[in-house]
Amino acid sequence: MDFSKFLADDFDVKDWINAAFRAGPKDGAAGKADGHAATLVMKLQLFIQEVNHAVEETSLQALQNMPKVLRDVEALKQEASFLKEQMILVKEDIKKFEQDTSQSMQVLVEIDQVKSRMQLAAESLQEADKWSTLSADIEETFKTQDIAVISAKLTGMQSSLMMLVDTPDYSEKCVHLEALKNRLEALASPQIVAAFTSQSVDQSKVFVKVFTEIDRMPQLLAYYYKCHKVQLLATWQELCQRDLPLDRQLTGLYHALLGAWHTQTQWATQVFKNPYEVVTVLLIQTLGALVPSLPMCLSEAVERAGPELELTRLLEFYDTTAHFAKGLEMALLPHLQDHNLVKVVELVDAVYGPYKPYQLKYGDLEESNLLIQISAVPLEHGEVIDCVQELSQSVHKLFGLASAAVDRCAKFTNGLGTCGLLTALKSLFTKYVSHFTNALQSIRKKCKLDDIPPNSLFQEDWTAFQNSVRIIATCGELLRQCGDFEQQLANRILSTAGKYLSDSYSPRSLAGFQDSILTDKKSPAKNPWQEYNYLQKDNPAEYANLMEILYTLKEKGSSNHNLLSVSRTALTRLNQQAHQLAFDSVFLRIKQQLLLVSRMDSWNTAGIGETLTDDLPAFSLTPLEYISNIGQYIMSLPLNLEPFVTQEDSALELALHAGKLPFPPEQGEELPELDNMADNWLGSIARATMQTYCDGILQIPAVTPHSTKQLATDIDYLINVMDALGLQPSRTLQNIATLLKAKPEEYRQVSKGLPRRLAATVATMRGVNY
C-alpha cells in the first residue's frame, strides 16, 4: 500500500478512497467490496500504530541528546571569549610595531636628506671647481679656433653654471658665458655662411649640433635665413629693374620662391629637426623684406590702370598670387601634420596680405567698376526703333555685368566680400533703372505723348504702341532674368562662403556669435590655405552681417530670400512705366478727340436744325465726327491688341501679369477680361475713354435743346460700340445719357436715384429747373 500520498500538500480524502477502491477487485459484488474496505481500514490502523511508535522513539532520542548540545554550546562560548582576548593582544602588538616603524622611517628620511645635501654640496664644489678650471682654460681654447672644442668647453661651463644658481656672482657668470658664446658665434660666422651658401650638409650638421648645445639655435637659423633671403631678394631686385608688367614680375618672384621651397625642404630635412617650419619661416621673412614691397607695387600698378581697369588689373595680379598659393598648398599638403600650423597661417597671411586692403574695400571697387561699365551701355538713340532695340539688347549686357561681378567676388574674396557685392549690385541696378527711365522719357517726347496739338488731324499710328509692346517684353525679360540671377546668386554665396558659417552659430545674440567663433577655434586643425579669413578680424561688423545672410539662406533655403528685393521692386516699377507708355500711346488719339468736347462752340450755338423743330425723332440725328473717329478707333483695337493673345513670348506674358493698367474696373463689376490680356487692355482703354468723355461732357458750359439730343446720340453711339465689343458701359455715362434724354418737365422725376451732383451739373448745362 502507497502511504506517500498522505504527505502531499494537495491530499484529498475522497480522491484517495476512490483511487483505493478502483485498485481493488473488478467484479462489483457487495460482499467483495465490504471485504476490501475492511482490509483497507485494518491496514490504516496498523500504519497509524507504526507512526505513533516512530514518533515516540524520536522524541526520546531528542530528550536524551539535549544535555550534550548545551554542553557543546558552553564550550564554544568559552573558546570564543579566549579568541577575543588573543586578538586584543595581537592588535596592541601591531600598534606598537607601527609606532616603532614610523619613528625609524622618519630617522631614515632625515638621514637621506642630509646625504642628498652633502652630495649636492659636493657636486656644487666640483662644478665650481670645474667652472674655475674651464674659465681659466677657455682663452687658450679660443686660440686654437677649434669650434668643436670651444663648443664642448662652453657646454661644460653652461652645465656648471646651472649648478651655481644660488651663488652670489651667478649673474656675472651668466654675462661672461654669453660673451664667450658671442665670441664663438663671431668666430664661426664665416664658416656658417660658407656652409649654408654652399649647401654643405656635413658642415651644417656640425653647426646645428654646436649651436643646439650652447642654446643658440635661433641665431644659427638667422644666418640661414639671411643667406638664402639675400639670394631671393636679389632675384626680386633683378625682376623689378627689368621693364616688365607687374604680373610678369610676380610670376618670376613666385617661381623663385616655389623653387626655393622644394630645394630647401630637401636640404633642410637632412640638417634641421623641423625642416618644414624652417623653410616656411624663410618664405615669410622673404615676402616681408621685399624692396620695393608688394603692397607698394600693387598700389602703383592699380593707380596706373585708372578707375576703368583697376579691378581688372587687381584680379590679374591676384590670379598670379593664387596660382602660387595653390602650388605651395600642394607642396605642403602631404606633410601638413609635420608643419607648425601657426607658421603656415603666417605664411598664408604673408602671401595674401598685400591684397587685404583691396579685399576689405572690394564693395567700393566693384561698385565703381560696374557703374563705369553700365554707363558705357547705350540706351538712347536718335530714332525710337533704335532706342527700343538698345533697351532689348541691354538686358543681356546688364546680367552679364552682374554675373561677372559674382565671379569676381568669389575669386577675389572667396565669398567674404558678399556684403560689398550686394551693395554694388544694388547700385548697378539703380543706375540701369535710371538710364532705362530716361530712355522711356525720351521715347515719350519723341512720340509726343505728353503734349497734344489741339487742332491736329485724327490719324491712326500704331508704331508707338508696337514699340511699347517690345519695351514691355524687355521689362518681362528683366524680371525673369532677375529672378533667375537672384537664385544663382544665393546658391553661389552658399557654395563659396557657406564654409565660414559655424553649425553652432545663432543670430539671436552676439554671445552666440562669439561662441561660434570660439567653437571654430577649438575645432580640429584645418587646412590654413582653405580657411584664410581676412574679414573676421579686420571688419567684424561686416563679418557679422555676412553670417546673418548665410544663416538666412541656409535656414530658409536659397529659393526663399530677398537678396535683390530693392532691385526687383525697381524693375517692377520700370515695367509699370512701360505699361503706362504703351497705354498712353494707344489712348493718345482718343484723348486728343475727347479734349475737344468741352471746347466745341456748336453745343450752345443755334444751328439751322435748331430753328426747324425740336420734335424731330432722335434717329434722324447722326453721331458727330469726333465720336465716330473714337468709335472706329476703338473697334480697331482688338486687331491691334492681338499680339497679346497670339504671340508666344514668356517674357511678355510675365511682364503683362506683373504690370497694372490705369482705370481698373469698378468694384462689383464683372471682370471677364482678366483671363485674357488683350481683353484686359481693351477694357482699360474703354474705361479711360468713357471716364474722360464724361469729364469732358460735364465741362460743357451750356447746351441747346438740339445739342442735347446730339450729345445723347453721340453717347448712345459710344455705348453701342462698347456693347458690340462685349464691354459694359460705365454707370456715369449711362446716367448722363438718361439725364440728357429726359424732358425738362420730367427731369426732376428722372433724376431721382441718380447722383445729385451729376444731376445738378447736367441740369445747369441744359438750363432746366432742378
Curated annotation (Swiss-Prot):
<dbReference type="GO" id="GO:0006890">
    <property type="term" value="P:retrograde vesicle-mediated transport, Golgi to endoplasmic reticulum"/>
</dbReference>
<keyword id="KW-0333">Golgi apparatus</keyword>
<comment type="similarity">
    <text>Belongs to the COG7 family.</text>
</comment>
<keyword id="KW-0472">Membrane</keyword>
<dbReference type="GO" id="GO:0033365">
    <property type="term" value="P:protein localization to organelle"/>
</dbReference>
<comment type="function">
    <text>Required for normal Golgi function.</text>
</comment>
<comment type="subunit">
    <text>Component of the conserved oligomeric Golgi complex which is composed of eight different subunits and is required for normal Golgi morphology and localization.</text>
</comment>
<dbReference type="GO" id="GO:0000301">
    <property type="term" value="P:retrograde transport, vesicle recycling within Golgi"/>
</dbReference>
<dbReference type="GO" id="GO:0017119">
    <property type="term" value="C:Golgi transport complex"/>
</dbReference>
<dbReference type="GO" id="GO:0034067">
    <property type="term" value="P:protein localization to Golgi apparatus"/>
</dbReference>
<dbReference type="GO" id="GO:0007030">
    <property type="term" value="P:Golgi organization"/>
</dbReference>
<dbReference type="InterPro" id="IPR019335">
    <property type="entry name" value="COG7"/>
</dbReference>
<keyword id="KW-0653">Protein transport</keyword>
<dbReference type="GO" id="GO:0006886">
    <property type="term" value="P:intracellular protein transport"/>
</dbReference>
<dbReference type="GO" id="GO:0070085">
    <property type="term" value="P:glycosylation"/>
</dbReference>
<dbReference type="GO" id="GO:0000139">
    <property type="term" value="C:Golgi membrane"/>
</dbReference>
<keyword id="KW-0813">Transport</keyword>
<dbReference type="Pfam" id="PF10191">
    <property type="entry name" value="COG7"/>
</dbReference>
<dbReference type="GO" id="GO:0050821">
    <property type="term" value="P:protein stabilization"/>
</dbReference>
<protein>
    <recommendedName>
        <fullName>Conserved oligomeric Golgi complex subunit 7</fullName>
    </recommendedName>
</protein>
<dbReference type="GO" id="GO:0006486">
    <property type="term" value="P:protein glycosylation"/>
</dbReference>
